[in-house]
């Protein structure tokens, strides 16, 4: 069975990364893990090393105000709805629990792509193919997060650290960037 070009490219990239690449979290990502439950921090540090895709931490602990700002998207502020919890009546697992820790992290997949851009060479504007790192965070990018989840599951990291993925832990809402401590919904807030 022959693979179409797009799938073949994705497979080859996945296979090559599997063999030769090991990603690491940036200092910015590590800073965003401050105040997060240690199991989740250790999970993220181990996951990035085996992930088929590079990623960054986009959110760790959030205040009620930060959570509410996200809640307003698609409601009182232009954009799509990204959460069902407002930070006040309903709290997010990103918010501090009774033990002073956040129980959730969001990631953003980073993919290097070839793009055509206009650049100046010798005083002339020309089109040139360049490699650029692109953030993959839309619904059509779900497969990147699914790949990461599958790798974590197959490596036994979910069980090892007691983690669940937002892409499959709720029936009514798929939150692909979201990872949390299993059972976090039952842990009391501060």
Region annotations inferred by a language model:
Residues 59, 81, 167-169:
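Short loop/turn and capping residues at structural boundaries
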Residues 14-59:
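Active-site acidic/histidine clusters and adjacent loop/turn architecture
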Residues 65-108:
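Short, surface-exposed glycine/acidic/tryptophan-bearing loops
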Residues 1-21:
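N-terminal amphipathic/basic-hydrophobic helices that include classical n-h-c signal peptides
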Residues 91-190:
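Catalytic cores and adjacent binding grooves of peptidoglycan-active enzymes
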Residues 46-78:
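Extended, low-complexity, intrinsically disordered C-terminal regulatory tails
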């Amino acid at each position: 069975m022959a693979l179409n070009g797009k799938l073949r490219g994705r497979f080859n990239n996945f296979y090559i990364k599997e063999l030769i690449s090991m990603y690491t979290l940036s200092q910015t990502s590590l800073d965003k893990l401050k105040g997060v439950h240690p199991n989740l921090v250790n999970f993220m540090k181990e996951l990035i090393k085996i992930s088929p895709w590079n990623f960054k931490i986009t959110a760790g602990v959030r205040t009620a105000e930060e959570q509410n700002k996200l809640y307003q998207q698609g409601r009182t502020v232009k954009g799509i709805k990204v959460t069902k919890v407002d930070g006040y009546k309903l709290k997010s697992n990103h918010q501090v629990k009774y033990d002073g820790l956040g129980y959730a992290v969001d990631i953003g997949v980073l993919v290097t792509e070839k793009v055509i851009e206009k650049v100046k060479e010798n005083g002339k504007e020309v089109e040139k193919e360049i490699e650029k790192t692109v953030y993959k965070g839309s619904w059509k990018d779900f497969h990147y997060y699914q790949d990461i989840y599958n790798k974590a599951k197959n490596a036994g990291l979910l069980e090892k650290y007691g983690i669940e993925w937002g892409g499959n832990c709720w029936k009514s809402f798929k939150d692909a960037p979201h990872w949390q401590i299993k059972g976090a919904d039952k842990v009391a807030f501060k």
